[in-house]
Amino acid sequence: MENCDDLSSDENLPPPGDHRREQSQERARVGNRDESVSSTNMRSIGGAVHNQQQLYWTDMYNGSNNLENFWLCFSGNTSLADDPTVQSDSSASTQSRTNQSGTIAQETDNRNASNFPPRSTTRRGQTYESRDESQGGQAPSHQNQVPGVDRDEYAGDRSNVSINLPSVDQWREYSFSDNSFQGESRTVQRRSSRATHRVKNQFGSIGDGRTSNNTSLQEPVIQDTRNRNRSESSSTMSSQSRTEHAPIFRLQYNYQREADNRSSRLVQIQGHSAPNNANGLQNTGGQAPDIGPEVNGQSSDTRAMNMGNQMAQGDSHVPMNFVPRPLSNGVPRLHGVPRLVDMYDYELAQRAHARRYPTSNMPYGFPNAGFQAPPHMGLWPNNQNADTRAMNMDNRSRDRTFQMPPANAQVPTSSLSGLFNSSINHGSGNQQFQMGQSSSGSAPQLPALPENFLMAHANSQIPTSSLSGLFNAMNHGSGNRMNHSSSGPAPQLPNLPESFLMAHGIGQVETRSPAGPSNSSINHGSGNQQFPVQQSSSRPAPQLPNLPESFLMAHGLSQIQTSSTAGPSNSSMNHGSGNQQFRMGQSSSRPAPQLPSLQESFLMAHGIAQVETSSTAGPSNSSMNHGSGNQQFPVQQSSSRPAPHLPDLIRQEEEFLNTLEFEQFARRLYNDLLPGVDPNYDSGTSTSETPVLKFSITLKAMLYDYWRTMVQMQYRGANINFLQSIINLNARSAALNSSNARASGSADVQNQTVSATVEGADDASANVNALSDLLAQSFPRQAEGEASRRNDIDHPEDDLNQADSPKSDNQSDKDPPSN
């Protein structure tokens, strides 16, 4: 561990009362060790008149488990007024210290740290050196020969007052022959007069700048050089060394020695508590066991956070930095003594496994734990402390109930009865908001979250009221589920901006139901995120916003408004990915649902027709499935349009479509309508096979409908008007040129019944024979409805030549001629 810069008297000391200079000197003495020094612990040591001022700096441990080597750097006074050993000896030293205080302050006022001569003392091969003038005031290379400790651990400037504790087995108490250490004196073991004379002989005449190279001193003496200008006799120094010392502090702490077979040693220094950056459980919140010594009857463990702001008084000293050694049973132990944290981990792991909780995935945390903490295993004598790592949200320092660590939210509960159904699943997956509510208590309130937060999480701030009884857990993340009772006002969705609605493909829906629960829900986003909303009868009917046509086209949706005269509505809108649905519970106050007038190109592109079926009673069974998955549009329809239908074919008629007789008729008619176009162009069928026309089902049905009409007229003996029938057929075939039929072969267009009104004919057999001749005739120009698209049509055959077929999808987009 690196050494600390010692707090020496090498700097210029201001006269008593000059606090500004005192503070500047303190900063100079401390150096760059700002991170380890607290401003509240820095005190002035300007003179003896400031007996209550002290400078105590302990730099030890510093985040390492090895306490074998450290420096105690201190200077000045220490408050030992409560120590009974001090009071008996304080009066004897107060007078002598006071008499010399003024002289010390003035003699040391004009000194410069760079003028100090080098000094060196040794004790059993251990060297203590100070700065040398030849090195520009820098610390020379140290020659510390400490058993079991590397030299590099003692690197640093030790020209100031410092104490090295090389051996924890043998503790000695060293003296300081310095009158400026004006603390309340304490009865300590003092050096003999002989040792003091050796100190004098070693340093020579300090005031003259001479240094003795005597290295035979057996006691490690660290001389404060602020007294170097004083010429004192040996008896004077001996008298001072007995009475005017800075106290030596003891530390009581358990640590592991890494360099000596990891054997445990006991170090005891009485004074302040342990540092606050010591291997510690910084994310703790309960009352901690004491590791620091007691100060004025109070022990303050600085590593553990105390949410209750209470000092643990009289608690036992429980070590928390043992290095574990696992045994066969899985409980880490050190010399047969389990660590508190390891014992707690083991116990909680056993209980979590017994309750089928997930195993903890954190070294010292239990993200899935929420159960009662295990007993303290007898390690705490008073059994008053909670786990040091547990959060204590109710500010009770001695709460033994295990609280969730910071990985989870700590939600306090009250008035819980029955099964405990509260669950919070934080993260990804099945995060849910489940709220069981009654009408007996005040409503929980969500905080007023900012709009950008709501936008980022795609959630709406939904206030609730009159919630109590069952636990209402709200899990933040993806997914809200809220069940409301009828005792409070209905929840309101906020007025989300239009851009938000557009981005998520949802509309701001408000629903109302006169009685009973509502089944309306809004599911948007990914997965099973839903907004079930309980509605009252105080709000208007839900309305979908007027979304632009481009949005509807992109999502394959239509703006649907539904209503039902009785019972709930079964209309739903499913869009996006998966089973996301829009379900709306409707009342009888709204008009019937209507399909919008979608563009014909949209219908053709999706392979669906705008279908409306007439059903005077019962739900509608018409559905539209498009896109991916099970996205459906069940639509309640009215009877405002006639329903398109295919000809009703019996089995014999369907078989007739594949007969040679119908093929001959269809081929002849087809060739007359589309001359030069082979319907079997790329069919690959051989001549040996029956050359069945590769007409679409719709075209074959249309041709058959015409055929059946002709046959029926023949059997009736009706007078068929060939010209009118061909004109009607021409109009039907021209419809195949339209963009609607060419885009997808929609049944809405192609399945139109060829209502060829044929009047009168004596011989029906002549109809088919004369069909090709009649098709070649010129028909009168049909100007109405054609002027806007065609300037001139000299030959109606152009329309027939451009009629659509399965292999002529790129024909012109002409509208059907009006007759």
UniProtKB/Swiss-Prot annotation:
Keywords: Developmental protein. It is found in: Cytoplasmic granule. Residues 188-200 have a biased composition (Basic residues). Residues 1-46, 83-160, 181-249, 409-447, 469-497, 509-548, 561-594, 614-645, 777-819 are annotated as: Disordered. It comes from the Eukaryota. The keyword Nucleotide-binding does not apply. One of its GO terms (biological process) is P granule disassembly. Residues 17-36, 783-794, 806-819 have a biased composition (Basic and acidic residues). Residues 232-241, 427-442 have a biased composition (Low complexity). Disruption phenotype: RNAi-mediated knockdown results in sterility, and in P granule segregation defects. RNAi-mediated knockdown increases the sterility phenotype of meg-1 vr10 and meg-1 vr11 mutants from 15 to 100% and from 4 to 93%, respectively, and results in a larger proportion of under-proliferated gonads than in the single meg-1 mutants. Simultaneous RNAi-mediated knockdown of meg-1 and meg-2 results in defects in P granule disassembly in the anterior cytoplasm of the P1 blastomere causing some P granules to be mis-segregated to somatic blastomeres. P granule component, which acts redundantly with P granule component meg-1 to promote P granule segregation during embryogenesis, and germ cell proliferation and differentiation in larval stages. Together with phosphorylated meg-1, promotes the disassembly of zygotic P granules in the anterior cytoplasm of pre-gastrulation embryos. Together with dephosphorylated meg-1, promotes the assembly and accumulation of zygotic P granules in the posterior cytoplasm of pre-gastrulation embryos. Required for fertility. This is Protein meg-2. The lineage of its organism: Eukaryota, Metazoa, Ecdysozoa, Nematoda, Chromadorea. The gene is meg-2.
